[in-house]
Swiss-Prot record:
Keyword Transmembrane helix tagged: yes
Subcellular location: Membrane
Main subcellular localisation: membrane
Statement: the UniProt record of this protein carries the keyword Transmembrane helix: yes
Comp. bias regions, Polar residues: 192-216, 346-356
Keywords: Membrane, Transmembrane, Transmembrane helix
Residue segments, region Disordered: 46-90, 144-362
Protein name, per record: Uncharacterized transmembrane protein DDB_G0283675
Biased composition (Low complexity): 49-66, 147-160, 266-281
Any one GO cellular component localisation term in the record: membrane
Organism in which the protein naturally occurs: Dictyostelium discoideum
Topology of this chain in the membrane: Multi-pass membrane protein
Paired cysteines (S-S): none
Biased composition (Acidic residues): 284-294, 308-324
Length: 392
Protein backbone atom coordinates (compact mmCIF):
# COMPACT_ATOMS: atom_id res chain seq x y z
CA UNK A 1 0.00 0.00 0.00
CA UNK A 2 2.86 2.35 0.75
CA UNK A 3 4.31 1.87 -2.73
CA UNK A 4 1.03 2.63 -4.43
CA UNK A 5 0.51 5.76 -2.34
CA UNK A 6 4.00 7.04 -3.12
CA UNK A 7 3.55 6.43 -6.84
CA UNK A 8 0.24 8.25 -6.83
CA UNK A 9 1.75 11.15 -4.89
CA UNK A 10 4.70 11.55 -7.30
CA UNK A 11 2.48 11.34 -10.36
CA UNK A 12 0.24 14.09 -9.00
CA UNK A 13 3.24 16.36 -8.40
CA UNK A 14 4.56 15.71 -11.92
CA UNK A 15 1.24 16.51 -13.55
CA UNK A 16 0.90 19.65 -11.46
CA UNK A 17 4.29 20.92 -12.63
CA UNK A 18 3.39 20.30 -16.26
CA UNK A 19 0.12 22.18 -15.87
CA UNK A 20 1.91 25.18 -14.38
CA UNK A 21 4.35 25.42 -17.28
CA UNK A 22 1.94 24.91 -20.16
CA UNK A 23 -1.04 26.77 -18.72
CA UNK A 24 -2.16 30.08 -20.30
CA UNK A 25 -0.23 32.87 -18.66
CA UNK A 26 -2.05 35.93 -17.39
CA UNK A 27 -0.99 39.10 -19.23
CA UNK A 28 -0.87 42.55 -17.72
CA UNK A 29 -3.06 45.41 -18.93
CA UNK A 30 -0.13 47.26 -20.46
CA UNK A 31 0.79 44.27 -22.62
CA UNK A 32 -2.81 43.77 -23.75
CA UNK A 33 -3.17 47.44 -24.70
CA UNK A 34 0.14 47.44 -26.53
CA UNK A 35 -0.85 44.54 -28.76
CA UNK A 36 -4.30 45.97 -29.32
CA UNK A 37 -2.67 48.91 -31.12
CA UNK A 38 -1.39 46.46 -33.72
CA UNK A 39 -4.73 44.69 -33.95
CA UNK A 40 -3.85 41.57 -31.97
CA UNK A 41 -5.74 40.30 -28.93
CA UNK A 42 -3.59 38.33 -26.51
CA UNK A 43 -6.52 36.76 -24.68
CA UNK A 44 -8.22 35.30 -27.75
CA UNK A 45 -5.19 35.16 -30.05
CA UNK A 46 -7.02 36.77 -32.99
CA UNK A 47 -6.42 39.79 -35.18
CA UNK A 48 -9.09 42.45 -34.86
CA UNK A 49 -8.28 44.19 -38.19
CA UNK A 50 -6.37 43.59 -41.38
CA UNK A 51 -3.53 46.11 -41.14
CA UNK A 52 -1.65 47.44 -38.11
CA UNK A 53 -2.04 51.08 -39.20
CA UNK A 54 -5.78 51.55 -39.20
CA UNK A 55 -5.63 55.03 -37.71
CA UNK A 56 -3.76 56.28 -40.76
CA UNK A 57 -6.16 54.67 -43.22
CA UNK A 58 -9.12 56.26 -41.48
CA UNK A 59 -7.42 59.62 -41.73
CA UNK A 60 -6.70 59.16 -45.43
CA UNK A 61 -10.20 58.01 -46.29
CA UNK A 62 -11.74 61.25 -45.02
CA UNK A 63 -12.95 63.57 -47.81
CA UNK A 64 -10.54 66.42 -48.38
CA UNK A 65 -11.83 69.97 -48.61
CA UNK A 66 -10.82 72.15 -51.55
CA UNK A 67 -9.74 74.92 -49.20
CA UNK A 68 -6.98 72.74 -47.87
CA UNK A 69 -3.51 73.70 -48.99
CA UNK A 70 -2.16 71.74 -51.91
CA UNK A 71 1.27 71.42 -50.36
CA UNK A 72 -0.05 69.84 -47.19
CA UNK A 73 -2.29 67.42 -49.05
CA UNK A 74 0.52 66.26 -51.30
CA UNK A 75 3.23 65.87 -48.68
CA UNK A 76 0.99 64.98 -45.74
CA UNK A 77 1.76 61.29 -45.83
CA UNK A 78 5.49 62.00 -45.99
CA UNK A 79 5.24 64.03 -42.80
CA UNK A 80 3.32 61.25 -41.14
CA UNK A 81 5.93 58.76 -42.27
CA UNK A 82 8.63 60.71 -40.43
CA UNK A 83 6.85 59.95 -37.18
CA UNK A 84 6.62 56.30 -38.19
CA UNK A 85 9.78 55.53 -40.17
CA UNK A 86 8.79 51.87 -40.53
CA UNK A 87 5.47 52.69 -42.16
CA UNK A 88 4.62 50.11 -44.77
CA UNK A 89 1.51 51.93 -45.96
CA UNK A 90 3.62 54.82 -47.23
CA UNK A 91 4.92 52.56 -49.99
CA UNK A 92 2.00 50.17 -50.45
CA UNK A 93 -1.08 52.36 -49.99
CA UNK A 94 -2.79 53.45 -53.20
CA UNK A 95 -4.75 56.29 -51.61
CA UNK A 96 -1.60 58.40 -51.37
CA UNK A 97 -1.09 58.36 -55.13
CA UNK A 98 -4.76 58.98 -55.80
CA UNK A 99 -4.71 62.09 -53.64
CA UNK A 100 -1.84 63.67 -55.55
CA UNK A 101 -3.48 63.05 -58.93
CA UNK A 102 -6.81 64.51 -57.78
CA UNK A 103 -5.17 67.63 -56.41
CA UNK A 104 -3.40 68.28 -59.69
CA UNK A 105 -6.63 67.91 -61.65
CA UNK A 106 -8.54 70.29 -59.38
CA UNK A 107 -6.08 73.19 -59.68
CA UNK A 108 -6.52 74.01 -63.36
CA UNK A 109 -8.54 72.34 -66.14
CA UNK A 110 -6.29 70.74 -68.75
CA UNK A 111 -7.94 70.29 -72.14
CA UNK A 112 -7.20 67.88 -74.93
CA UNK A 113 -5.61 70.56 -77.08
CA UNK A 114 -3.07 71.26 -74.34
CA UNK A 115 -4.48 74.71 -73.44
CA UNK A 116 -4.85 75.35 -69.69
CA UNK A 117 -7.01 78.37 -68.79
CA UNK A 118 -7.36 79.59 -65.19
CA UNK A 119 -10.84 80.05 -63.79
CA UNK A 120 -10.55 83.56 -62.34
CA UNK A 121 -9.49 85.28 -65.60
CA UNK A 122 -12.20 86.25 -68.12
CA UNK A 123 -10.68 86.03 -71.56
CA UNK A 124 -13.87 86.00 -73.58
CA UNK A 125 -14.07 82.26 -74.09
CA UNK A 126 -17.13 80.24 -73.19
CA UNK A 127 -16.51 76.58 -72.54
CA UNK A 128 -19.49 74.40 -71.88
CA UNK A 129 -17.76 71.03 -71.65
CA UNK A 130 -14.30 69.62 -71.84
CA UNK A 131 -14.21 69.09 -75.59
CA UNK A 132 -11.54 69.62 -78.23
CA UNK A 133 -13.68 72.29 -79.93
CA UNK A 134 -13.27 75.74 -78.34
CA UNK A 135 -16.11 78.23 -78.89
CA UNK A 136 -14.82 81.79 -79.28
CA UNK A 137 -17.02 84.89 -79.01
CA UNK A 138 -17.12 87.32 -81.96
CA UNK A 139 -16.95 90.45 -79.76
CA UNK A 140 -13.17 90.20 -79.43
CA UNK A 141 -11.63 89.49 -82.80
CA UNK A 142 -8.08 90.20 -81.58
CA UNK A 143 -7.97 87.06 -79.52
CA UNK A 144 -9.56 85.01 -82.30
CA UNK A 145 -6.97 86.24 -84.78
CA UNK A 146 -4.19 85.31 -82.40
CA UNK A 147 -5.55 81.78 -82.33
CA UNK A 148 -5.78 81.48 -86.11
CA UNK A 149 -2.50 83.18 -87.05
CA UNK A 150 -0.05 80.79 -85.41
CA UNK A 151 -1.80 77.78 -86.93
CA UNK A 152 -1.92 78.99 -90.57
CA UNK A 153 1.00 81.34 -91.21
CA UNK A 154 4.01 79.47 -89.87
CA UNK A 155 3.25 76.35 -91.87
CA UNK A 156 3.09 78.14 -95.26
CA UNK A 157 6.44 79.99 -95.30
CA UNK A 158 8.38 77.12 -93.78
CA UNK A 159 7.81 74.78 -96.73
CA UNK A 160 9.20 77.03 -99.50
CA UNK A 161 11.98 78.38 -97.29
CA UNK A 162 13.37 74.96 -96.42
CA UNK A 163 13.04 73.26 -99.83
CA UNK A 164 14.98 75.69 -102.07
CA UNK A 165 17.84 76.12 -99.60
CA UNK A 166 18.74 72.45 -99.55
CA UNK A 167 19.39 72.00 -103.31
CA UNK A 168 21.23 75.33 -103.55
CA UNK A 169 23.66 74.31 -100.82
CA UNK A 170 24.14 70.80 -102.15
CA UNK A 171 24.60 71.47 -105.88
CA UNK A 172 27.54 73.92 -105.79
CA UNK A 173 29.41 71.83 -103.21
CA UNK A 174 29.53 68.74 -105.45
CA UNK A 175 31.21 70.24 -108.60
CA UNK A 176 33.90 72.13 -106.65
CA UNK A 177 35.83 69.12 -105.29
CA UNK A 178 36.26 67.29 -108.60
CA UNK A 179 37.99 63.95 -108.57
CA UNK A 180 40.29 64.85 -111.50
CA UNK A 181 41.86 67.95 -109.89
CA UNK A 182 43.18 66.54 -106.59
CA UNK A 183 45.50 63.92 -108.16
CA UNK A 184 47.33 66.65 -110.12
CA UNK A 185 47.95 68.73 -106.99
CA UNK A 186 48.50 65.90 -104.52
CA UNK A 187 51.53 64.06 -106.02
CA UNK A 188 53.99 66.96 -105.48
CA UNK A 189 52.47 67.53 -102.05
CA UNK A 190 52.88 63.89 -101.09
CA UNK A 191 56.52 63.77 -102.23
CA UNK A 192 57.59 66.94 -100.41
CA UNK A 193 56.30 65.99 -96.94
CA UNK A 194 58.08 62.63 -97.13
CA UNK A 195 61.44 64.30 -97.75
CA UNK A 196 60.78 66.66 -94.86
CA UNK A 197 59.50 64.12 -92.38
CA UNK A 198 62.22 61.47 -92.85
CA UNK A 199 65.11 63.60 -91.47
CA UNK A 200 62.99 64.46 -88.46
CA UNK A 201 62.69 60.76 -87.77
CA UNK A 202 66.44 60.16 -88.16
CA UNK A 203 67.27 62.89 -85.65
CA UNK A 204 65.73 60.77 -82.93
CA UNK A 205 67.31 57.57 -84.26
CA UNK A 206 71.03 56.81 -83.95
CA UNK A 207 71.33 54.85 -87.24
CA UNK A 208 73.56 56.57 -89.82
CA UNK A 209 71.57 58.01 -92.75
CA UNK A 210 72.61 58.26 -96.38
CA UNK A 211 74.80 61.38 -96.84
CA UNK A 212 73.19 62.26 -100.20
CA UNK A 213 69.77 63.42 -98.98
CA UNK A 214 70.08 63.84 -95.22
CA UNK A 215 73.64 65.03 -94.59
CA UNK A 216 72.64 68.51 -93.47
CA UNK A 217 70.14 67.21 -90.91
CA UNK A 218 72.13 64.49 -89.11
CA UNK A 219 74.90 65.29 -86.58
CA UNK A 220 77.37 63.01 -84.81
CA UNK A 221 78.09 63.15 -81.10
CA UNK A 222 81.11 65.41 -81.69
CA UNK A 223 78.93 68.03 -83.39
CA UNK A 224 80.26 67.38 -86.91
CA UNK A 225 77.62 67.11 -89.65
CA UNK A 226 77.55 63.91 -91.64
CA UNK A 227 78.94 64.02 -95.20
CA UNK A 228 80.95 67.24 -94.70
CA UNK A 229 83.72 66.24 -97.12
CA UNK A 230 85.01 63.29 -95.07
CA UNK A 231 85.13 59.63 -96.00
CA UNK A 232 83.53 56.85 -94.03
CA UNK A 233 86.91 55.41 -92.96
CA UNK A 234 88.08 58.65 -91.43
CA UNK A 235 84.81 59.01 -89.58
CA UNK A 236 85.19 55.54 -88.10
CA UNK A 237 88.74 56.33 -86.99
CA UNK A 238 87.64 59.43 -85.13
CA UNK A 239 84.54 57.89 -83.65
CA UNK A 240 85.70 54.57 -82.29
CA UNK A 241 88.55 55.63 -79.97
CA UNK A 242 86.45 58.30 -78.33
CA UNK A 243 83.58 55.94 -77.70
CA UNK A 244 85.80 53.19 -76.31
CA UNK A 245 87.89 55.58 -74.21
CA UNK A 246 85.06 57.22 -72.27
CA UNK A 247 83.50 54.24 -70.49
CA UNK A 248 86.92 52.90 -69.46
CA UNK A 249 87.97 56.13 -67.74
CA UNK A 250 84.81 56.16 -65.68
CA UNK A 251 85.87 53.09 -63.72
CA UNK A 252 89.71 53.14 -63.88
CA UNK A 253 91.83 56.29 -63.51
CA UNK A 254 95.12 54.59 -64.51
CA UNK A 255 96.25 55.63 -68.01
CA UNK A 256 97.72 52.31 -69.15
CA UNK A 257 98.21 51.41 -72.78
CA UNK A 258 96.23 48.20 -72.38
CA UNK A 259 93.11 50.01 -71.31
CA UNK A 260 93.23 52.52 -74.13
CA UNK A 261 93.83 50.04 -76.93
CA UNK A 262 90.58 49.59 -78.83
CA UNK A 263 89.79 45.97 -79.60
CA UNK A 264 87.70 46.50 -82.71
CA UNK A 265 90.26 48.48 -84.79
CA UNK A 266 92.46 47.35 -87.69
CA UNK A 267 96.26 47.14 -87.48
CA UNK A 268 96.70 50.41 -89.37
CA UNK A 269 94.48 52.17 -86.90
CA UNK A 270 96.50 50.82 -83.97
CA UNK A 271 99.75 52.07 -85.49
CA UNK A 272 98.31 55.53 -86.00
CA UNK A 273 97.11 55.72 -82.42
CA UNK A 274 100.47 54.47 -81.06
CA UNK A 275 102.40 57.07 -83.07
CA UNK A 276 100.13 59.77 -81.74
CA UNK A 277 100.81 58.65 -78.17
CA UNK A 278 104.61 58.45 -78.68
CA UNK A 279 104.68 62.05 -79.83
CA UNK A 280 102.80 63.13 -76.73
CA UNK A 281 104.69 61.10 -74.11
CA UNK A 282 105.65 64.13 -72.04
CA UNK A 283 102.08 65.25 -71.60
CA UNK A 284 100.91 61.76 -70.81
CA UNK A 285 103.63 61.31 -68.16
CA UNK A 286 102.62 64.50 -66.40
CA UNK A 287 99.02 63.44 -66.46
CA UNK A 288 99.91 60.01 -65.13
CA UNK A 289 101.88 61.53 -62.22
CA UNK A 290 98.93 63.66 -61.28
CA UNK A 291 96.61 60.72 -61.55
CA UNK A 292 98.87 58.59 -59.34
CA UNK A 293 98.95 61.28 -56.65
CA UNK A 294 95.21 61.50 -56.73
CA UNK A 295 94.89 57.74 -56.53
CA UNK A 296 97.19 57.62 -53.50
CA UNK A 297 95.14 60.21 -51.72
CA UNK A 298 92.02 58.31 -52.58
CA UNK A 299 93.48 55.06 -51.32
CA UNK A 300 94.47 56.74 -48.07
CA UNK A 301 91.03 58.12 -47.64
CA UNK A 302 89.43 54.85 -48.61
CA UNK A 303 90.73 53.18 -45.46
CA UNK A 304 89.36 55.83 -43.15
CA UNK A 305 85.72 55.67 -44.06
CA UNK A 306 85.88 51.92 -43.75
CA UNK A 307 86.76 52.30 -40.05
CA UNK A 308 84.05 54.85 -39.63
CA UNK A 309 81.62 52.59 -41.44
CA UNK A 310 82.43 49.76 -39.06
CA UNK A 311 81.75 52.05 -36.14
CA UNK A 312 78.57 53.21 -37.75
CA UNK A 313 77.56 49.65 -38.42
CA UNK A 314 78.03 48.83 -34.77
CA UNK A 315 75.99 51.85 -33.81
CA UNK A 316 73.33 50.88 -36.30
CA UNK A 317 73.18 47.34 -35.03
CA UNK A 318 72.52 48.38 -31.46
CA UNK A 319 69.19 50.17 -31.97
CA UNK A 320 67.97 47.30 -34.13
CA UNK A 321 68.44 44.93 -31.21
CA UNK A 322 66.69 47.33 -28.84
CA UNK A 323 63.75 47.86 -31.17
CA UNK A 324 62.96 44.16 -31.63
CA UNK A 325 62.16 43.09 -28.05
CA UNK A 326 59.22 44.69 -26.30
CA UNK A 327 60.13 43.44 -22.80
CA UNK A 328 62.21 45.78 -20.65
CA UNK A 329 65.58 44.30 -19.69
CA UNK A 330 68.93 43.35 -21.14
CA UNK A 331 69.41 42.22 -24.70
CA UNK A 332 70.27 38.65 -23.72
CA UNK A 333 67.07 38.33 -21.76
CA UNK A 334 65.12 39.59 -24.73
CA UNK A 335 66.81 37.13 -27.09
CA UNK A 336 66.16 34.11 -24.89
CA UNK A 337 62.49 33.15 -25.16
CA UNK A 338 60.59 32.56 -21.97
CA UNK A 339 59.06 29.13 -21.43
CA UNK A 340 55.79 30.77 -20.42
CA UNK A 341 55.53 32.49 -23.77
CA UNK A 342 56.18 29.22 -25.61
CA UNK A 343 53.79 27.02 -23.67
CA UNK A 344 50.88 29.42 -23.30
CA UNK A 345 50.69 32.72 -25.09
CA UNK A 346 50.26 35.66 -22.78
CA UNK A 347 48.02 38.64 -23.49
CA UNK A 348 51.01 40.92 -24.13
CA UNK A 349 52.94 38.72 -26.55
CA UNK A 350 50.05 37.27 -28.56
CA UNK A 351 46.69 38.84 -27.82
CA UNK A 352 44.94 36.73 -30.44
CA UNK A 353 45.76 33.46 -28.71
CA UNK A 354 44.85 34.72 -25.25
CA UNK A 355 41.57 36.12 -26.45
CA UNK A 356 40.72 32.90 -28.25
CA UNK A 357 41.25 30.81 -25.12
CA UNK A 358 39.40 33.31 -22.98
CA UNK A 359 36.50 33.45 -25.42
CA UNK A 360 36.32 29.67 -25.51
CA UNK A 361 36.03 29.64 -21.75
CA UNK A 362 33.31 32.28 -21.87
CA UNK A 363 31.39 30.31 -24.49
CA UNK A 364 31.65 27.18 -22.38
CA UNK A 365 30.37 28.99 -19.30
CA UNK A 366 27.53 30.59 -21.23
CA UNK A 367 26.49 27.28 -22.71
CA UNK A 368 26.57 25.71 -19.27
CA UNK A 369 24.52 28.55 -17.79
CA UNK A 370 21.95 28.34 -20.57
CA UNK A 371 21.77 24.59 -20.27
CA UNK A 372 21.33 24.57 -16.51
CA UNK A 373 17.60 25.28 -16.80
CA UNK A 374 16.99 22.42 -19.19
CA UNK A 375 19.27 20.08 -17.25
CA UNK A 376 17.50 20.79 -13.97
CA UNK A 377 14.09 20.17 -15.50
CA UNK A 378 15.08 16.88 -17.11
CA UNK A 379 17.05 15.80 -14.07
CA UNK A 380 13.99 16.36 -11.90
CA UNK A 381 11.88 14.21 -14.23
CA UNK A 382 14.48 11.44 -14.35
CA UNK A 383 14.93 11.58 -10.61
CA UNK A 384 11.19 11.24 -10.04
CA UNK A 385 10.92 8.26 -12.37
CA UNK A 386 13.84 6.54 -10.72
CA UNK A 387 12.33 6.98 -7.27
CA UNK A 388 9.01 5.61 -8.46
CA UNK A 389 10.74 2.69 -10.17
CA UNK A 390 12.66 1.69 -7.06
CA UNK A 391 9.63 2.12 -4.82
CA UNK A 392 7.61 -0.20 -7.01
Amino acid sequence: MKLNNSFFFMSVIFVFLIIIQFSTATYSKSEIEYYKRFGYNLETGEYTRSSPHQHQQQYQQQPQSRQRNRHNSRYGSERRSRQNPYNEDYYSNQNYYQQTSNDLDETAPVYKQGVSIPKNINVGISIDEVTPNVIVETNKPTFSQSLTKPTEKPTLPLKPSIEPTLPTTRKPVEPEPKKTLPPTTQPPETISPKSQTTPAITQHQISTPSPSQQSHHFFYGDGRPAGAGTDDKEEEETKTPTRTHKPINIDDDDDDDETKKPTRLNNNDNNKNNNHRNNNNNKDDDDEDEDEDENKNKNKNKGKPNIDDEDNDEDDDEPEETEEPTITGSIEEAKTPDPNLIEGYSSESDPSGSQSTHEDNLIATQSNSSGKISITFFSFIIFSFTIVFFLI
